[in-house]
Each structure stands twice: as structure tokens, then as C-alpha cells.
Amino acid sequence: MTKIAFTGGGTVGHVSVNLSLIPTAIEEGYDTFYIGSKNGIEREMIESQLPSIKYHSISSGKLRRYISWDNIKDIFKVLKGVLDARSVLKKEKPDLLFSKGGFVSVPVVIAAKSLKIPTIIHESDLTPGLANKISLKFAKKIYTTFEDTLNYLPKDKADFVGATVREDLKTGDKHRGYQLTEFNNDKKVLLVMGGSLGSKKLNDIIRQNLETLQETYQVIHLTGKGLLDNSYVGTKDYIQFEFVKDDLTDLLAITDTVISRAGSNAIYEFLALRIPMLLIPLGLDQSRGDQIDNAKHFESKGFGKTILEDTLTENELKTQLREIETNRDDIIKQMQTYKESFTRQDLFQKIINDALSE
């Protein structure tokens, strides 16, 4: 039986494609296992959503683009991670490795190369991340979500495959969504998502402008962990959650407009659902700028609007939401021109063919 190793972690985006592909691998009769960090979000997601999958943890060090003494310490963590990963791979003997990126993936890809295990890596963002730039030297192929990403990569190794969204994404139940929120279908619904960690600045501006927003919308506010404000409990046309997992598809089913960070996986899900979006990407003080690139690219395609976090004000928020509502039909029409390049099954078969071909 062909066996496939999966790796990737550090953020939700570095796990979600794996969560989509692993069930396909199992359905097709392949044996699978996962390699990730000991305490990363990937472990929590894999063990909670795919509890039957064997999970192996390895040492991992963060990859930084700036000078820091921590880089010296983390070199040794990465080296230990390579040894840990080699041990796992020698024991499991996979036929191929699929890597979604993130700092934990680098030692796994290096270890796989040392054992002559073919590796396919996947890049979700418009510009390649540091982990995938390093891993590319040891991989057979890299797949991209954005077609323009091919401009940053060697032609003989890079293939555009488009976004891979969850199979259950379009199965949300509107009735259940209205039940969860106690909203009704007489008024538009605005979903606000500040990412898993939340955004205090975005949360504050939403709450400060709640009365104005409620003139147009019923508001679902995903605040991030520890950022609920109990003084708003019971407020008409407003409901807040720290984080939603199992019921998110039901909430998306009733959403007319979304305010969100600009992680690639999330914004492609909004695109697949034809939900106009106002994107507020992580700034350069919190990231390498990948979300800014993603957001500007989506805005250039006519899928929504963008506000940079350092220019996020009450007035700018109102202006951009007004623009979205004025041009809603045109935005949705533009979204309808987007076609998914590969089904989940097609992408999985491509991985197998590319990895195992001579």
C-alpha cells in the first residue's frame, strides 16, 4: 500500500489544505501519517479533526527574516528536527511527502530529501514564504494557489493549481445559521473575523460604530480568544463569539458581507461562496507582508476592498463598506468569473503522479 507523509504547521493556513487532502487519501486507499511540532496549532487541528491519523512530533525552530540571537538557538532546533524527522521517516517508510509549509516543514523536507523520498510542496500566498523558499531546494515540485506566484519560482518546478477549499464549505445550513444567531433574513448579515488571535483595533472600531453598522447589517463578530466584551451580551442585531469551528459554515451561509484578515485560505473560501469582502491584512509589524499582497491582489480582481491596518479608521471603515454595498452586484458578478482549477480529487491525483513519476 502506498503511504503518504503530510507536514505543515504554525498557522491554520499551513494545515487546512492537508485537512482537505488527507480524507481523500484515505478514501482512495492510501495510508497516511502527519509530522508536526509538539505544541503547534497543527497538532490540535489534526488530532481533533482527524483523530485516526497517526501524529509524530518533532523539534522545530522559527525561521526569521531579521537578525536575532534566537536564530542561533533555533538553528540547533532545526538540526534536531531534521534528525527527528529522519527517524520518523525511516520508521514509517512513506512513498512521498506533501508539505504545506510553515517553519515545522523545513526539517521534514530536508530529511525526506536525505532519504530520497520525493516531496511536493504547496504555497498558498501570492509571494512564497521563507520556509517554502528553503524547502524548494529539496523538493520535486511546488504548487501555487495564485497564478501570479509562478513569476517568483523556477518554471521547471512550479505548477499553478488554484485554491483547494473544504468539501463541507458549501453545505452550511441557513436555518441553523439564523438559529445560532437569532437573526432573521429581513436584513443583511455582516461577519467580522479578526483571525484566530483577534484584532483589538478592529474589535474596538466595530463596537464603536455598532449603531451605524446596524442601520444596514446584523453583525456576527468573531473577536478572537479572550476578547469578548460581556457588556454587549443581549444587544439587538449583534452576537459575538471568540472563535467558531463546527458552526462556521452555517454562519457563512447567512453572511452577505465579510470583514476579514487576508490569509489565502480564508479569502478563497469567501470567493468560492461569492461573499463580497473588506480585507484588513496583517501589517508589516506582524507578518512578512503576505496578507497585504493577497488583499491587494483580490482588490485588483474586483472581489472586494482593502484597508491597511495602520489606516483603519471609523470613517474609512464606513466608506469602504458603503462602496461594497453600492457595487455589490458587480463584485458578485466578478467573483462568478473565478473557476476552481482542480477538484480535491484531481489535485490529489496530481500529487501522486508528480511525486512518483520518474
Curated annotation (Swiss-Prot):
GO molecular function, one term: undecaprenyldiphospho-muramoylpentapeptide beta-N-acetylglucosaminyltransferase activity
Sorted UniProt keywords: Cell cycle, Cell division, Cell membrane, Cell shape, Cell wall biogenesis/degradation, Glycosyltransferase, Membrane, Peptidoglycan synthesis, Transferase
Pfam families: Glyco_tran_28_C, Glyco_transf_28
Catalytic activity: Mur2Ac(oyl-L-Ala-gamma-D-Glu-L-Lys-D-Ala-D-Ala)-di-trans,octa-cis-undecaprenyl diphosphate + UDP-N-acetyl-alpha-D-glucosamine = beta-D-GlcNAc-(1->4)-Mur2Ac(oyl-L-Ala-gamma-D-Glu-L-Lys-D-Ala-D-Ala)-di-trans,octa-cis-undecaprenyl diphosphate + UDP + H(+)
GO biological process: carbohydrate metabolic process; cell division; cell wall organization; lipid glycosylation; peptidoglycan biosynthetic process; regulation of cell shape
Membrane topology of the entry: Peripheral membrane protein
Catalytic EC class: transferase
Task of the protein: Cell wall formation. Catalyzes the transfer of a GlcNAc subunit on undecaprenyl-pyrophosphoryl-MurNAc-pentapeptide (lipid intermediate I) to form undecaprenyl-pyrophosphoryl-MurNAc-(pentapeptide)GlcNAc (lipid intermediate II).
Name the UniProt record assigns to this protein: UDP-N-acetylglucosamine--N-acetylmuramyl-(pentapeptide) pyrophosphoryl-undecaprenol N-acetylglucosamine transferase
Organism: Staphylococcus saprophyticus subsp. saprophyticus (strain ATCC 15305 / DSM 20229 / NCIMB 8711 / NCTC 7292 / S-41)
Origin organism lineage: Bacteria, Bacillati, Bacillota, Bacilli, Bacillales
